[in-house]
């Protein structure tokens, strides 16, 4: 790091009554001072330790400067702090907070790993290790909530949702997807919701080829999650919510065999349209009288030719009216084994899965989980797992903020309010002191969260 302040300074001669000089000359300072909260959240979850335990060392020990667990933590904490690209490693190599998060001495510790070292790490992980790391993510999150709820959840909802991950190079298994209209991967994200809580917790994120059918891997993911959830919450009722891309006979038969409740959207066809027609006629009459969007709910028994048996289908017959446009008919169908009224099943159970879209937006826009620019498919799978781990830490941070104004904040807002704090670091033989700004706007919330993860007044 250069100590030549003449090259690190800028001067403003007309911003105030005095000349204003800005210097980047504080080696013991960082702009991520609040990120120590993430380390506390990680210790509560045991997440990076569990994922690092899945890694197998392949390097010559005499030449190792960065242990595998340090490399993993370096990437996870950097992603959570907003540094999604491995190229950011060069800027963060001497950052005292980033070193502290990894487990090194904040001031005197050796520099963190470089981008080439991190790239070699990403490309050295095999599919077996990736599978174990994905299981470690699910196990850590589920175990955390088993402790929180004392194993007494009444109902647990599993949501799977595919999303597109646009690719812009020659990545392995990148294909053109006609639905999304670009070259991409097609990952699937898995979330669990406990009882009627507002948060959906990420427990799985599996990268898939860009031309993968929506159902690819879905049964395997559900089976593994159900086994873990039943072991952790033996008395909980499991419920599965899926969009129409997952509606296939194999999945319905699997869910029936597992004896779980489900609500799964289904695409319209001529037979279902015929079942919906009486309801659509009522909706047309209602919207003609009111001039507003109207919908009517009903149900029918239906069995496609490929199905093993007849199932209940809830119908939403809707006519949409928008100003300046002709009315648009919009019948919707949901396959379910719930016994509630059609309106309740659709509006209370199925529509609630819309919150999953907000979680996926956080992953894309808050943590850039689609930063999958490695050539190897497995390296990109590792990247999304590390980003998923960073998101799990941010969700734990949000959970700890439950009694503050940050309780429902998006990831980017949490980062700005709680992590992006200027800090000057002082070390001694016995302690590390973080000098944070007295004028921090959310200092009370920060202290409250810190106490929830074990900090005590000093």
Language-model features: locations:
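Basic, amphipathic alpha-helical segments enriched in Lys/Arg and hydrophobic/aromatic residues
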Residues: 369-440
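Domain-level cores of phosphate- or acyl-group-handling catalytic modules
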Residues: 212-271
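Short, glycine-/Ser/Thr-/acidic-enriched flexible segments
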Residues: 163-165, 208-210, 269, 320, ...
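Dynamic "connector" segments at or just before major functional cores
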Residues: 1-232, 398, 422-458
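An anionic, glycine-rich sequence signature occurring as long contiguous blocks
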Residues: 5-24, 261-365, 448-458
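Short, glycine/acidic-rich hinge or "gate" loops at secondary-structure transitions
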Residues: 90-92, 105-107, 238, 401-411
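Short, conserved catalytic/metal-binding motifs centered on acidic residues
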Residues: 41, 74-75, 88-89, 114, ...
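Short amphipathic alpha-helical "interface-anchor" segments enriched in bulky aromatics
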Residues: 41, 89, 343-382, 386, ...
